[in-house]
């Protein structure tokens, strides 16, 4: 089997999950500043601002029964370090935001396939999922 179609399918699933979380955050009053922001250390799925808080959101979209507990285990210490470095790079390019309180959130989205098609649901939204140590 050619891995490219599967990779494209997984990327599309991730994009749909990010779009779902983006909509959720906007409904909660957050202003989205960036989506899929890239730097040498990785990618920030979503960056949002509300009042005096800036959040960096890692979105994990999985099928039910995934090996990594719905994506939660995929945000281990190495991934957290990459996200922190990427956030520092983002702030260095946007110094006017550096005085805001920063938080790292993780959104877990479940992708369910059925005879009627595919649906997505927010399983958990972890505010302050990890901290800068």
From Swiss-Prot:
A GO molecular-function descriptor: nucleic acid binding
Lineage of origin: Bacteria, Bacillati, Cyanobacteriota, Cyanophyceae, Synechococcales
Protein name: UPF0102 protein CYA_0680
Pfam families: UPF0102
Sections of the chain in a coiled coil: none
NCBIfam families documented for this protein: PRK12497.1-3, YraN family protein
InterPro entries reported for this sequence: Restrct_endonuc-II-like, tRNA_endonuc-like_dom_sf, UPF0102_YraN-like
Family affiliation: Belongs to the UPF0102 family.
């Amino acid at each position: 089997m050619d891995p490219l179609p599967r990779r494209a399918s997984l990327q599309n699933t991730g994009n749909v999950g990010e779009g779902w979380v983006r909509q959720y955050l906007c409904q909660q009053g957050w202003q989205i500043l960036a989506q899929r922001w890239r730097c040498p250390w990785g990618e920030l799925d979503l960056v949002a601002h509300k009042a005096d808080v800036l959040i960096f959101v890692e979105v994990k979209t999985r099928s039910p029964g995934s090996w990594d507990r719905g994506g939660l285990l995929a945000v281990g210490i190495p991934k957290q370090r990459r996200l922190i470095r990427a956030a520092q790079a983002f702030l260095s390019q946007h110094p006017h935001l550096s005085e805001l309180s920063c938080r790292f959130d993780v959104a877990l989205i479940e992708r369910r396939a059925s005879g009627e098609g595919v649906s997505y649901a927010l399983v958990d939204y972890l505010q302050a999922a990890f901290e800068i140590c």
